[in-house]
Amino acid sequence: MSVENVRQFFKKYHLENRIAEHENIGDTVEHAAELLKCEIKQIAKSMTFIVAENPVLIVLAGDKKVDNKKFKSTYNSRPKMIPFDQVADRIGHIPGAATPFAIKSDVKVYLDVSLKRFETVFAAGGSTNSTIELSIDELENYAHPLDWVDVGKD
């Protein structure tokens, strides 16, 4: 999938023009924050895991890492990240461009409570040089998460 898939996804909500394409690459939260001139914590970081053989995408604030104990308590398994070379096949986006939009139908999406600190966040737009700024309500509405979770390290 690509920025065009994400653009098509948002077209049905008339938000496709909010996807910004940048000259430089923002494939890490640090690069994205520098590119957008915002704080790292305002980047909606998508992390991909395998839970009970299923692909899971968790969106956290950019300044958070996954807490192994919280993850195990939430999902009844230790965190196992999807290998780098399998992310595109399992999720539908390449590493550094993963986003909860225009993903494969079997991916389970969760939003971490660390995002609730902000009015808006910047999510990847389907490529390493595209982003979309969304309010937390918009993120929740369009990402279609199964639930809010608390798996970020304090």
Regions found by a protein language model. Give the residues of each.
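Extended, low-hydrophobicity, polar/charged segments
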Residues: 1-154
